[in-house]
Amino acid sequence: MRSGLRGGASHRHDALRYLFEIEKGYNGFVTITRKGKGKYRMEIVKIPDSGKTKFMELLLIADEQVSMIEKYLFRGDMFALCDADVKAICVVTQEQSGVYEIKNIITVPEYQRKGYGQRLISFIADYYKKPGNVLYVGTGDSPVILHFYEKCGFEKSHIVKNFFLDNYDHPMYENGQQLVDMIYLKRHL
């Protein structure tokens, strides 16, 4: 996950304002438990195609090339986890029958390490759950990120050699390390 937020808080407020103006399709709820603050419910909103580009600045934190995001944005489902602010967003595509892939997931930097990403992944797994279905996620070779996905029930699947070198127009870095190969993890649903 990249740090820094291009466009800052005002862009997030535009996206949040949009969330409350849209005619919402599927809405789900998750319960978040915070130490010392008890439990509370947060809404998960499925974003229609007409609103997806409003979240581009957040998507660019996790996948910093617009042309790569454009390849999957409108062929996937986008979900936002929110309460009074957007906490996390996710784009999931169907790659073939019963095979889904998280193409982009980002927790807003100031809300990271509070369980929002895990709750969103848990919701996504339940949303696409059917016997035989599989959920994939691809990421760079960052031990912190790999550990996060393993905690979410994923296991290593395969590697696409030189993915970041062959598909991005500039070097990609994660925690100071240049990304070369795409590591795929899978979770049986």
Model-flagged regions — what are they?
Residues 128-140:
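Conserved GNAT acetyl-CoA-binding A-motif
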Residues 80, 85-94, 98-106:
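Conserved beta-strand in the GNAT
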Residues 118, 141-172:
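Conserved active-site alpha-helix within GNAT-family acetyltransferase domains
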Residues 20, 26-50, 183, 189:
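Conserved N-terminal entry element of GNAT/NAT acetyltransferase domains
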Residues 40-68:
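Short amphipathic alpha-helix that is part of the acyltransferase structural core
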Residues 105-112, 140:
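A short, internal acetyl-CoA/4′-phosphopantetheine-binding micro-motif in the GNAT/acyltransferase core
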Residues 111, 115-123:
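Conserved acetyl-CoA pyrophosphate-binding loop and the N-cap/start of the following alpha-helix
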